[in-house]
């Protein structure tokens, strides 16, 4: 997205790049790295939190729960909405084909519980969305629903899943409502057709 915004590369499909597009992208990143653009490359959740909380970096790619963890320390860390849009990703649960009998029944019970609302409410307070929106919203307070899903200012403090304050009354969530945020997804993370080539080139970038 940076390369395209700068006019360096025009992609046919950023979510499924060609080998030529991958080559051009990695070449761009290697030059940026050699020019001192990047402070660090985090390898764990805690490392990403510490880099931001310490002030060692001021902008980075982060998971939403990591942003929440930084905010619990009283630091105003936010996802900055970009005019180019967001990079989106999602995950889901699936059952193994060999399950049968009590194991299959137990797996379905777990899926039912997972989608019943508690998990959706928990991850909402980390900044994530559940695929089952209605049950997730039902597990939140009116204030939390307004803040996380509806783009409304908080009417009271917003807290993390473990109770630490992350936002004050009057704050609005970065990016707006559920609908507004999803409407701005410009590319979805997925397994590209040229994934093996991409992995090899990414290793070149790491080693540069």
Question: Positions of the model-derived regions?
Answer:
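Sec/Tat-exported extracytoplasmic proteins
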Residues: 2-6, 32-37, 56, 64, ...
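Extracytoplasmic/periplasmic substrate-binding proteins
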Residues: 37-100
């Amino acid at each position: 997205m940076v390369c395209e915004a700068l006019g360096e590369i025009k992609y046919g499909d950023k979510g499924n790049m060609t080998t030529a597009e991958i080559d051009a992208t990695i070449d761009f990143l290697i030059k940026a790295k050699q020019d001192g653009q990047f402070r660090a490359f985090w390898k764990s959740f805690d490392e990403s939190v510490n880099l931001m909380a310490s002030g060692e970096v001021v902008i980075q790619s982060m998971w939403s729960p990591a942003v929440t963890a930084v905010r619990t320390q009283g630091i105003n860390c936010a996802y900055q909405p970009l005019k180019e849009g967001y990079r989106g990703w999602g995950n889901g649960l699936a059952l193994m084909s060999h399950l049968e009998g009590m194991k299959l029944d137990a797996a379905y019970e777990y899926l039912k519980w997972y989608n019943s609302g508690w998990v959706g409410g928990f991850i909402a307070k980390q900044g994530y969305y559940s695929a089952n929106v209605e049950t997730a919203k039902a597990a939140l307070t009116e204030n939390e629903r307004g803040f996380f899903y509806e783009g409304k200012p908080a009417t009271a403090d917003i807290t993390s899943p473990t109770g630490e304050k992350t936002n004050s009354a009057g704050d609005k969530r970065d990016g707006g409502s559920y609908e507004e945020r999803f409407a701005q997804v410009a590319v979805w993370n997925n397994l590209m057709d040229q994934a093996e080539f991409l992995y090899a080139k990414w290793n070149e970038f790491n080693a540069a």
